[in-house]
Amino acid sequence: MATPSMMPQWAYMHIAGQDASEYLSPGLVQLARATDTYFSMGNKFRNPTVAPTHDVTTDRRQRLMLRFVPVDREDHTYSYKVRYTLAVGDNRVLDMASTFFDIRGVLDRGPSFKPYSGTAYNSLAPKGAPNTSQWIVTAGEERAVTTTTNTFGIASMKGDNITKEGLEIGKDITADNKPIYADKTYQPEPQVGEESWTDTDGTNEKFGGRALKPATKMKPCYGSFARPTNIKGGQAKNRKVKPTEGDVETEEPDIDMEFFDGREARDAFSPEIVLYTENVNLETPDSHVVYKPGTSDDNSHANLGQQAMPNRPNYIGFRDNFVGLMYYNSTGNMGVLAGQASQLNAVVDLQDRNTELSYQLLLDSLGDRTRYFSMWNQAVDSYDPDVRIIENHGIEDELPNYCFPLDGIGPAKTYQGIKSKDNGWEKDDNVSKSNEIAIGNNQAMEINIQANLWRSFLYSNVALYLPDVYKYTPTNITLPANTNTYEYMNGRVVSPSLVDSYINIGARWSLDPMDNVNPFNHHRNAGLRYRSMLLGNGRYVPFHIQVPQKFFAVKNLLLLPGSYTYEWNFRKDVNMVLQSSLGNDLRTDGASISFTSINLYATFFPMAHNTASTLEAMLRNDTNDQSFNDYLSAANMLYPIPANATNIPISIPSRNWAAFRGWSFTRLKTKETPSLGSGFDPYFVYSGSIPYLDGTFYLNHTFKKVSIMFDSSVSWPGNDRLLSPNEFEIKRTVDGEGYNVAQCNMTKDWFLVQMLANYNIGYQGFYIPEGYKDRMYSFFRNFQPMSRQVVDEVNYTDYKAVTLPYQHNNSGFVGYLAPTMRQGEPYPANYPYPLIGTTAVKSVTQKKFLCDRTMWRIPFSSNFMSMGALTDLGQNMLYANSAHALDMTFEVDPMDEPTLLYLLFEVFDVVRVHQPHRGVIEAVYLRTPFSAGNATT
């Protein structure tokens, strides 16, 4: 050990090694400093030792990790409990901050998992194009019933001849020149056809193809899949063959040949086409029918016109930082960290603590949350800003886009050659009789690619995520009654004209119905997509994950020598543990999770024995107790807001408000908030983001006012604010006095309060917070003001309130109120009214704002804008020793579903951990002014 000193040997705890100047020669140090401006040596001469610079003993001391295997495990329906014995030997210190749970198990993401948009099968096929199919038509009366088989499709493979043996595709290279016929088990192959567009020789070729028999139910080609049944790729099922000699029943491919001749042939028939008809295992793994002409699934002429749509993407993965996997703040499901000598549990759960949210905000303060860290599954939930707020600046489509026939010409007529003769013309025998020549411009079709891309983006990303009340079930389609299932959500469609390219054109505006829809439940949630893809792209996953401890009293503890019991519970409720893009009920939709092993990995401080014993001696002293603050340090309370309610009164009984820091609040949907007090919440039928736990708040814009009244006579927070004391007006719909700010309906007063609370900026000039303060969850980064003009329905005399079914725009070029085939005729649009140009109609301006992720904050301190009237002692009345009751009233926008007011009282949430003797650990929890903790001593 180095020279003894009365000072604690903190020097031995250097983890990064010595400073370079301590061990490099003076000349090299001088050179590095002199050349630093144009050539940085950086860490090229970094001391190679890791951790303590000296007094490290054995290689065992330097072991990176130790694995602890559970001494007991309990696998229940909804939870998995593990217990470890942590034996910390003499002259060692266990670093709890280095511990993590190493979990292995099996995950079934269920049939609702779809990790991509579109379809993987025939994605280039038109949505309404059928496979080559057959159907049976029954005609006639009861006495003379006839059934005929009808076929629709294409035969693409050219052959030399057609006989009763099938399509001749070549000749054997022998003296006999035997014909080679297509192997019916896989030929003609659907992917083989004519190699060129040229076919001008006038001969009558023979063609073969494949077709699906009437017993195979029709599906659109888009999304169709049938598994192969032989190694050549053939897909036919097998059929039973009637027993022959020996009564042995055999099987053969269910394939028959059907021959066709031209309709004009009357007698001397000769086959021009042969179709190899078969039954296959037809399925649609990632698409569904969105247009169905009738109720029957049987093959028919009408069902040729079915139209497909891809299933909606639904990424499923573990939550950010494994939110929800470990039990926190749940009665009877918290963990244990107890010394075996005393059996006092250092872990005390409180219903109103915010362990998960606190951890999210802590990470945000430490680093950039947009950088993913796969080990802890750390990929923060996000959304595409272009989806939340649509900047509809139109389409750059000045030039037309054409597509042309493969030959570049189009249909041509056949001409023969002639030549002049005297005063007339005669046939030219030197020129072919069949010359295919087109006249005029070459044929082309125009498609507005930019407009289609923009319209498709709006439908896939915005329209399909509209609230269910705006959607409908397609005719002749039956969906389940449970609206939380993937099948129901996937089957509902919406009219594209609700969110079309001409809606709010030229404006930066979010669709009003979408403002209250969780934007993080979306397939463009990049964090969830990353977490889903970490697990792979299949439904069944054998996973191996590392999960950190988040509980503030345990996660950074230095555990001194002794023997300890450490146990924790892990959830198996898929709705809590997993997250999905659509937020469907994963329990109903067949997801499941099972754990096969949960081990604990831990690291000892890599110190010499004598150094560790010095550290132990220091920490055993009660003046050096370890104290930890919960990062959020707040008591949270949830107050129910009934559907369509606008006022929420809150009363807090009388107490002393010393050391109180202020309020934070936001709004949550009841559906998206689990009951943390119970081990398993049977009513939590949702798997999207959980704002209560992960910080994905999005309803801040629904607050109008908040008033705060203490039972004292003090006007709080003073009279020098723009508006009345004790009341904070958050937004104004009508703003005659000009109190609003930033082209939106937020008041200047509230903007200033947020700048003060988040950045300590109480200045009304141009002052932007420093980058290190303006984090992902902060106010300034997430504040999004917007405005638009709409028709003045009162003062524009010619205004007609034409409802959606009677509006037309792009008629003839789009489907009618449905994402189906285009219909109608080209005609002048009757919607929307022009807001620009010489014929612009009278308009009014609408303003609003969105502010996601953050929580509204109101600070409480004696220097906040002169907090009320000060006494002659310079002490605010509220800080006197007398207790005060608190009344708060929140005014909010009505919502058509029950919600919750999430209110944080910012206090000091502290734990003090004392380890006086070997194997003894004591903890005292202190919370002011909401002292709800209890000591374990």
Curated annotation (Swiss-Prot):
GO molecular function per UniProt: structural molecule activity
Swiss-Prot/TrEMBL site (Involved in interaction with pre-protein VI) positions: 762
Stated name of the protein: Hexon protein
A GO biological-process term: microtubule-dependent intracellular transport of viral material towards nucleus
Superkingdom of the source species: Viruses
Region Disordered: start-end pairs: 190-210, 224-251
HAMAP family: ADV_CAPSH
Modified residues (Phosphotyrosine): 925
Alphabetical list of InterPro entries matching this protein: Adenovirus_Pll_hexon_C, Adenovirus_Pll_hexon_N, Adenovirus_Pll_hexon_sub2, ADV_hexon, VP_dsDNA_II
Cellular-component GO terms for this entry: host cell; host cell nucleus; T=25 icosahedral viral capsid
Lineage of source species: Viruses, Varidnaviria, Bamfordvirae, Preplasmiviricota, Tectiliviricetes
Keyword terms, alphabetized: Acetylation, Capsid protein, Cytoplasmic inwards viral transport, Host nucleus, Host-virus interaction, Late protein, Microtubular inwards viral transport, Phosphoprotein, T=25 icosahedral capsid protein, Virion, Virus entry into host cell
UniProt family annotation: Belongs to the adenoviridae hexon protein family.
